[in-house]
């Protein structure tokens, strides 16, 4: 199909312009033109400034605080669950690749009805057309509803958000109503703004009928509406650590009413350097809270966090704790040079375009994201880019275009992509291999979600040879084809999975909405939709 008209002349510029990051909406085409101006913070992780956040927050002496009692155990085991033999329970857990640890772990449920959710949640589940709970939900719901601290390890796209959101609704409805000046009852920490918004969307769906209010607090967006939400009172606050600490330090909210704490994608939050902020936030929450920690992996750093913050916790792992890929994703690795990548990409896009599938292309840097997007759009491909230096309004627009299928090709950096909830991505292309194989697993986990099949293509160069051995192990475990060149690299190349993740630098400011100027701005090509005479004819 071809795209015509529609966007009347103005795409966004997005080039690396000189100057001071010009403000204001530019004239003419109205696109985003500004480059990266001088100074300022380059967006980093979800817009949160790392700095010395939390210095103004004092630890609370909880021993001398008068704390109101609260209820957190709401679980009544369904008679059908009780009637199952131990052998049946073990067989079900084995079938779902479910491993448990801890004392007195509740039995898993097998249907939504067995969870014992109230009618206002069950009606929403039925309306959304879910047929059966996912593996993580079968075990995590009884654990969470029983009021226990829990650790849940499961791959991205496994239904983790619903696993903690629905018990949160039950928890809130059993607590006293918020009084003026009260902070939230449920706090959900997430690494990125995209994941925070995704969680908020699910909380809104299931909280409407019981009038549970929520807000998402994250950097890169105006503080005003977020402050208003907090001051009016919300039962659920979904937040990235940096912006939340900002709100706490300036007295815009407090965490004295929090009795249900969730840390989602805990491994990623630690990777991104948020541990000091997380520790400062948790110090502001009463120690007898219920704490739930969700993570895709279980490295030592996450284990230490769990030991410090959770009490007598129970744990469920879905699948192996070894680094394994989603088996619903067909993995294809091609060993090549950097010079070969563009031609390989075009070849794969030609093939994929016959199926009208959505494609997520991962690149290493913001510059590559912008340059490659420009190259693809000049060649007629409907591609857009998302990364940490883009304004929030632009990121939201790009994501909406991708989700709707109007622009079915999206380029992304790792930080921008984590937590993106686009369920019908058919293909992932690793244009640049990530720093380590853990990120490779997360990347290809963007496709093959919710039981669907997906495909990944990965371009692997000599510069990536340190990761060859671990990648071969992942491919072998998935029964995927292993290129001979990759096996050779694994035999003779470096050991381990490559260097650790970088912290993401302080880029030169954000740049404003300009008029398409600046060196390399794309308002006349790469990212602009042609107006007037019917736009460009897409290859899609």
Swiss-Prot record:
TM annotation in the entry: none
Organism: Cryptococcus neoformans var. neoformans serotype D (strain JEC21 / ATCC MYA-565)
Annotated spans, RNA-binding RGG-box: 492-519
Protein name per its UniProtKB record: ATP-dependent RNA helicase DBP2-A
SMART domains on file: DEXDc (SM00487), HELICc (SM00490)
Subunit field text: Associates with polysomes.
Residues in Helicase ATP-binding domain copies: 141-316
Sequence motif: Q motif, positions: 110-138
InterPro entries: DEAD/DEAH_box_helicase_dom, Helicase_ATP-bd, Helicase_C-like, P-loop_NTPase, RNA-helicase_DEAD-box_CS, RNA_helicase_DEAD_Q_motif
């Amino acid at each position: 199909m071809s795209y015509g008209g529609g966007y009347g002349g103005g795409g966004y510029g997005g080039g690396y312009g000189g100057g001071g990051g010009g403000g204001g909406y530019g004239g003419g085409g109205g696109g985003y033109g500004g480059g990266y101006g001088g100074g300022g913070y380059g967006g980093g992780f979800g817009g949160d400034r790392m700095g010395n956040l939390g210095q103004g927050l004092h630890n609370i002496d909880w021993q001398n605080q008068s704390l109101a009692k609260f209820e957190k155990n709401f679980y009544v085991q369904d008679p059908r669950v009780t009637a199952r033999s131990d052998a049946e329970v073990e067989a079900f857990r084995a079938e779902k690749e479910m491993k448990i640890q801890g004392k007195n772990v509740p039995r898993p449920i097998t249907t939504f009805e067995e969870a014992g959710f109230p009618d206002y949640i069950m009606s929403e589940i039925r309306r959304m057309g879910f047929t059966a709970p996912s593996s993580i939900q079968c075990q995590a719901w009884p654990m969470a509803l029983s009021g226990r601290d829990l650790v849940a390890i499961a791959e991205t796209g496994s239904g983790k958000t619903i696993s903690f959101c629905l018990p949160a609704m039950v928890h809130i409805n059993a607590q006293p109503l918020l009084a003026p000046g009260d902070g939230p009852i449920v706090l959900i920490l997430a690494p990125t703004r995209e994941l925070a918004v995704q969680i908020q969307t699910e909380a809104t769906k299931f909280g409407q009928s019981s009038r549970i209010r929520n807000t998402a607090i994250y950097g890169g967006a105006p503080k005003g509406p977020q402050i208003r939400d907090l001051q009016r009172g919300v039962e659920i606050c979904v937040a990235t650590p940096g912006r939340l600490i900002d709100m706490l330090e300036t007295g815009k909210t407090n965490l004295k009413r929090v009795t249900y704490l969730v840390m989602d994608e805990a491994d990623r939050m630690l990777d991104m350097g948020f541990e000091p902020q997380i520790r400062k936030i948790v110090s502001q929450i009463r120690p007898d809270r219920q704490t739930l920690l969700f993570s895709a992996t279980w490295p030592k750093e996450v284990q230490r966090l769990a030991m410090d913050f959770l009490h007598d916790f129970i744990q469920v792992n879905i699948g192996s704790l070894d680094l394994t890929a989603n088996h619903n994703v067909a993995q294809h690795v091609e060993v090549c040079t950097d010079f070969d990548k563009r031609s390989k990409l075009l070849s794969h896009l030609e093939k994929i375009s016959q199926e009208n599938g959505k494609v997520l292309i991962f690149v290493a840097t913001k510059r590559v994201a912008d340059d490659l997007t420009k190259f693809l759009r000049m060649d007629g491909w409907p591609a857009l880019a998302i990364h940490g230096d883009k304004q929030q309004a632009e990121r939201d627009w790009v994501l909406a275009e991708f989700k709707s299928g109007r622009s079915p090709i999206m380029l992304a950096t790792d930080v921008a992509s984590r937590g993106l909830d686009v369920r019908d991505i058919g293909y992932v292309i690793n244009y640049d291999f990530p720093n380590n194989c853990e990120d490779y697993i997360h990347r290809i986990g963007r496709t093959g979600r919710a039981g669907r099949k997906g495909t990944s293509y990965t371009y692997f160069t000599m510069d990536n040879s340190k990761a060859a051995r671990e990648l071969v192990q992942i491919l072998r475990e998935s029964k995927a084809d292993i290129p001979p060149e990759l096996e050779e690299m694994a035999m003779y190349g470096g050991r381990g999975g490559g260097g650790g993740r970088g912290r993401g630098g302080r880029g030169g400011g954000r740049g404003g909405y300009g008029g398409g100027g600046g060196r390399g701005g794309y308002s006349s090509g790469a990212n602009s939709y042609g107006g007037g005479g019917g736009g460009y004819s897409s290859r899609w």
